Amino acid sequence: LAQQAGAQIGKCFSISMNEYGGANTKASITYAFRPDTCNDAMRLPVFGGLLVDAEGGRFINEGFMCERCMFAAEPVVREGYHYAIADAAFMNRLATEPVSDFYGDARMKGMFDGIVLSDLLEQFDAAAEEGWAFKADTLAEVAEHFGLVNLVATVEEYNGYCESGSDEQFFKDAAYLNPVAEGPFYAVQSMPAGWLSLGGIKTNAAGQALDAHNHAVAGLYVAGADADLFTSPYY
């Protein structure tokens, strides 16, 4: 609408991806944020368990999802679709133990203190019905469903790291080395999700939209994330 009124788009447009958030457009609520705001299965990638790319290979130190979310988004954006893989033992723990038990970072522990995902298994079934989660008795079935051609080999290698207590690939903290060994096996498909777009309509210092000649468009003001000024110099 602003462009139709004669305003120009600034040159600092981008997407804010500096933190990770689970998301899938197939889900009835597409984005995971605060507790009780989405299907809890969407949170599976942020508990330090195994994450794989679209071919079934690891691509990140999964502990970053728990403790260093500012570092987690770039690999996720690069990979696109990614999958959290868990076994029955891990899922049962998530459904019965406080979420804070899965985090080593004190800030995260405080944020989720006392919260238990007691409806996780039922919500996972709902996610499977929507098409963004899948459960099977074997890893091979999970791999076939999502086309994760390297998943079985990846899990075999990963379980070796869990047994030894040393991640030789991404050097994840041993506290997050939970094996994927006991069926049934669970997979949750996620896609990148950003907070907002950065940049937009070019404005002057008074927030007035500018036209192609940098003259103010009468009566048109732009603020916040819709304005180019928000990105540069303030963001």
Residue ranges and their predicted role:
Residues 1-235:
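Residues forming the flavin
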